[in-house]
């Protein structure tokens, strides 16, 4: 069994961050979202991975390499334009061959991994495809499944205006080689994309057995800032505390906190769960719960909580930042007057002056 991991796409809902960075490489708890998926695939015993890249064809390979650090053998497959999930399967046919495979969207996050899902697909009576579903409050932004009274999949719609159920497709799919004929048979949707929902519907219409499983655990598509912050919160809730850097005697550390190698924290208060990467300098500051501070950041005389601060950025003299995603190489500095809190989405290399 192989894996096909999708790490292309433009990430419009995470702009301006994604103007200069692949959405799958935005870090939660100081680890790129994509890495969680690759680790889950490796933990499930799959070693051969085809990684779809598009505009990310330079950045993703630099971050992931050949896959050896994950215990994987990665082959990169370039998708010239984001033409749909089924198009990704179409261009990966040569790589996938006649193997069963799991397709994993690289910006999705699932608590608990996919070990059991892979095992039951391998060992059971294999359907042509198995899809994962979850109940959502607003299914109109997702692929949506319609089930019969016995739980069989009878229909799929892609981002319907009037959904027939609240069961959204989770970004993990299991396929046999039957899917290859289906992706060749369908036409582009009104969006100009080959939709995987249409390919699965083609299988249904031709009598194939399509199984579903409703997952009850935590799942998020990290396509927007709010969901990225929630995934960061979820990961930090299971943080194993450790102090590898330097914390002076005037600093108070409470709860589950990680201070990375080479970090220096002076005269500050760190309230977990929170993670500080390798090399930051934090002084005279408050770092509150559910905050991730990336490598080589600087925070001076500031307060921040429930936020993600990516590597190489600096915050100076800011009274309070919360619910924010701050890109790489960003500078946030004090100005004259500050409100009680600030909320940002800052792209890489931004510079913001704040009144205090």
Swiss-Prot record:
Signal peptide (residue range): none
Single Gene Ontology BP annotation: antibiotic biosynthetic process
Molecular-function GO term, any one: glucose-1-phosphate thymidylyltransferase activity
Pathway: Antibiotic biosynthesis
CC cofactor note: Binds 1 Mg(2+) ion per subunit.
EC number: 2.7.7.24
Name of a matching Pfam family: NTP_transferase
Iron as UniProt keyword: no
Catalytic reaction list: dTTP + alpha-D-glucose 1-phosphate + H(+) = dTDP-alpha-D-glucose + diphosphate
Function, as annotated: Involved in the biosynthesis of the two 2,6-deoxysugars, dTDP-L-oleandrose and dTDP-D-desosamine, attached to the macrolactone ring oleandolide to produce the aglycone antibiotic oleandomycin. Catalyzes the formation of dTDP-glucose from deoxythymidine triphosphate (dTTP) and glucose 1-phosphate.
Family of the protein in this entry: Belongs to the glucose-1-phosphate thymidylyltransferase family.
Protein's name according to its UniProt entry: Glucose-1-phosphate thymidylyltransferase
Originating organism: Streptomyces antibioticus
The organism's taxonomic lineage, starting at the top: Bacteria, Bacillati, Actinomycetota, Actinomycetes, Kitasatosporales
